[in-house]
């Protein structure tokens, strides 16, 4: 999972704590509770109009869609702006030049605050939520990184195929019954089963259940609670929700404890992530993960390892259904590359270059980890004009960075996978596409997620024609991560795939795509 964080920046949540940068290890000062302390010339940064005393920039704000509020303000105020609520002020960045400046690892580091800090009661100092000064980040990273090597990925591939086969079996049954499929719900089942099987040898039997597995319900509860903390001045206002969150955390922990106990009682697995957590020592120090840290890492991987990928797949399928020319071109590539093979081999997935472009373009328009925070390692000047004190931080709005016209052109809201053609990528400035975060603390499971999602898109395109609901308009649910809400789709079973053309080139080269149904608008939710 990318280093996503809460998306409002208008919280009464926990203050940041002392941190260090991964490169220097030098302790940074206590994180600034409000931007006034860390930005000496804050008044030069624009803020929304109609600011209220004490309350701040709350007029027109929605507790349910804080990201889309921030996107609206971004379109109005420019590439850097600030928001204030309940006595705290925060700086947001989305301009591609400023974001590239903050990607400089010699000057900036990951900042753990807002939504990420709100998850620490769930997973403590696990990979995703550890403060930079906490040693367990480096320990876990070094122990677990080999679990995402090419050799490890090739070993996961057959299990990914098995889970995908359960998805298509479920979709075949829905198709036979004349029902539309629940895309986000089924992608969540798929990706949970995939990370559970490949990483921990566990089967949640998600496709055999009429309702979501209780683990998913508890996970959604904890993510939603972490997001809600960003919208109130004090957790005391969420007493009932806090009790529910405590119960959700307890269920997550019990589930993981049972999973670990079963592995220990069974005498080990096949060298998966859980085996690494339990049995592998650090290659240099010989240190091992503690029992508490193992629990935290397992929860992190089960949650982060499927939540963002399910959203990415759901958005990609949404855009494929709306753009039949794109779907035809992607499907032709699958037929050509995979041919008559009953199941694709590991190496064949990476050859689906156009399918991968479709996935990247969906992640551009709706990065499921929609923001990440960066803090200054030393006093510096952002973009040559905004002084920052050491420890000051800003929230990079990935969802708006990915639509910056300076980087992506005047049609940045339009779905067009050819933006990720190799020549187009080379011509574009660096640090303009950040769905997995940036730097040393970027998503450790990036290649896992991309392989899984590309494989699944290829399998679904090979098997089905996708038909959108003509009445559906994209609505986006925010719970730290993003997911299309209520997306259902009709399927048509494909006839046998045509014989690939002798030239080996894909058919259906039409470049035309369906534009978003609204012109460029800061709020990219209604009508996509």
Regions found by a protein language model. Give the residues of each.
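N-terminal membrane-proximal hinge/A-helix region immediately C-terminal to the signal-anchor transmembrane segment
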Residues: 2-6, 17-125, 135, 139, ...
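Cytochrome P450 proximal C-terminal region
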Residues: 24-45, 74, 164-168, 217-221, ...
